[in-house]
């Protein structure tokens, strides 16, 4: 994150103790060895107390051998509720750097999770929840983005109607660098501000601290820690690396005299992707503007769109929860009649999540089961 944060009790100086009879156990939680962003956490007990460890194969990730490159439409309302937030993830797209899918938990988690290799970005399409982490807890609501740093031990409790879009990234998930001034502060004119982010509140009592197992995700398998002490035992912490949430209702979409390209809607970025949000907003104000997207060829990216709510004028056959993938090399844009129908429109109420992947995205077997097979033909139909 771009600003310093502190919770609870920490020593006056790093790597020191306040009382010889009650030494807090310091943990450096940091990326890129000792050179990246980090926080210092102070435990009452040793965070290394693992009495046994075992391996479980990860069955959720199911790559397909489909080798057809074309535009796709997936109908995620066809996905049934499944498992919990650990074992019930339904992966849909992947490449060497990211994984994308939907979670519709049918049951509560019964252990903690820690992703050893990937950062996680969640979007709450439906429902609400509570994220409990080693840093504290964050209440979650419909429309929330949730960032969970790689290596974070967490427990996610969700409502029965929760539907969550998730992205796992092997590259760091950042705020776009162009949104920051040279001091690291968010600039004026960005779609959000520092006070829009919700940060963890450290526990006085640890309500989620009832399990001693941690599923450590290594992408294709889990290592399961069986601990002999409770894990949420932090007296305090400070630093620049921690989970956070931000709701799309707090964001201010950028508009212009003429149609604005997708990058103006960017919210998060990484070496191999960017994530943006299309939000309700006034359309362009040139008297002859065409208010929907022009035709374009994604020469260097695959364009993923998750449609959350509202009317998507440029697309036919789309419903809340639909996903489209527009691949590089094949032109896409408004479907027949959409340009003409858009003339005179003054605003849009659409809400959608966009992921631009810089490496081609592949489909899973789960994705093929919910695909609208005729979507590629939709541009040839009047």
Q: Predicted segments — roles?
A:
Residues 1-382:
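Jelly-roll (double-stranded beta-helix
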